Amino acid sequence: MTFPPSPVDTDMEPTRPSRRRWLWIVSGTLAIVVAAVSLGVAALQLGLPWQMGENDRNHVYEGAAGSQRYQVHLPPQHDGTARLPVVMAIHGCAMTGYGWNSMKSTTQFNSLADREGFIVVYPTQLISRNVIACWNSADPRHQQRHTGEPALLAGVAREVVQKYDADPARVHVAGASSGAGTAVILGVTYPDVFATVTSVAGGEYGLNQVDPDNPDATPPLDTARQGWAQMGDRARRVPLLVIQGEQDEVVPPLVGTRLVAHWTAVNDLVDDGLPNDSLDPTTKTMSVPGAAGRHAYTRTEITAPDGSSIVEAYRVQDMGHAWPGPDGDGKYTDHAGPDASAIMWEFAERNPMS
C-alpha cells in the first residue's frame, strides 16, 4: 500500500528560502547594523542637530594633509563692525570637539565668548585617525609643519580667519591632555599662526622621546632645541600658559614642570640662538589658599624685562587629570579648581601677536 505525500512534505519545500535569498537577508541585516553603528559613532563624535546653537556652524577643512571637521561658535559681537579674536580649543583622549564628552561642554567657552567677544573653534578627532580619539601628539609624523595634524589645524585656523574676517594677530590655541600636546606642537610649527598656547595637563614638544623611568636622560633643553629648530625663520617668542594638577596620574606633575623649563628654554633660544639666559627673565610666584571647597594653587609668572609673558603656570593642589572650572560639564572636569577658561582668555587677551 502506498500513501500520498503528506501536506507537510508538499507545503514546506516550496516555501523554504533559497541560499541566495538567505544571503540577501543576512547582507541586508548586516548593512542595517553597520549603518546604525556608523550613525551612532557619528552622533557621539559630531553631536546631534539639536545640540547646535543658533550661532554654531559646522565645517570641513580640506587641505593637502587631508580633511578636518570642526565647529565654530560666533558670539553676538560678530556683526561686521570689528575683527574678532579666535580661540581654538583642542580636546583630549576619549573626548570630542562638539559631540559626546566634548571640549565645548568641558570648557564652556561659548558662554565666555558671548560675554567677551571672541570666536571659538572646536576641531574634533575621528576614530579613523585614532581609535580612542586622541590627537597624535606623540607621533613624530604629527610634529612638523606642512604635515599631519599640525597642518590640518593650522589650515582650520586660517580658514576661520578668512571665512569670518577674524583678527589674524589674535588667534590662540588651547588644549587638554593629548590636545595640549598638539597645542604645544602648533606653537613651534606655526608660530606665525598662533599668538599664544595654553596647555592643560599636557607636555613639551617631543615628549615621546622622554623615558618616564629615566626622564633626566633627556633634559628639557634637548627637546627645546628641537622645538626651536621647528620654528625656523618664523621663530618668535610665543607666550605659554600651563595648568597642571598635582594629583594627575595620567600626566604626572613632573611633565608640567618639564614643560615650563622646556618652553623657557625655547624662548631663550629664540632670543639669540644660545641657551644662555639672555632674556634675563623674572620669576614671581604667588600662592592662593583653598577655601569653601576650592582647591589651593600656586601661580608662577616668568616674564621678560619688558614685562611681556614667557610662561605662566598654575599648579593646582588635589586636582587630577581634568580641566578645572566651576561650570564645566564632562568626564574630565574639576569644579573645585580655578576657572581655566577665564584664565586662558585673560592670558590670551593681553598677549596678541606682535
Which residue ranges define each predicted feature?
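Alpha/beta-hydrolase active-site loop
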Residues: 141-164, 185
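A domain-start/cap signature at the N-terminus of enzymes
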Residues: 2-86, 101-107, 111-119, 171-174, ...
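Short beta-strand/loop motif that positions the catalytic acidic residue
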Residues: 242-244, 248
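Short glycine-enriched nucleophile-adjacent loop
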Residues: 180-192
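Structural cue for short, hydrophobic secondary-structure segments
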Residues: 89-92, 122, 242, 315
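Active-site glycine-rich loops that stabilize anionic/oxyanionic intermediates
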Residues: 84, 92-95, 319
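A conserved short beta-strand
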Residues: 193-208
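Cap/lid segment of the alpha/beta-hydrolase catalytic domain
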Residues: 122-148, 210
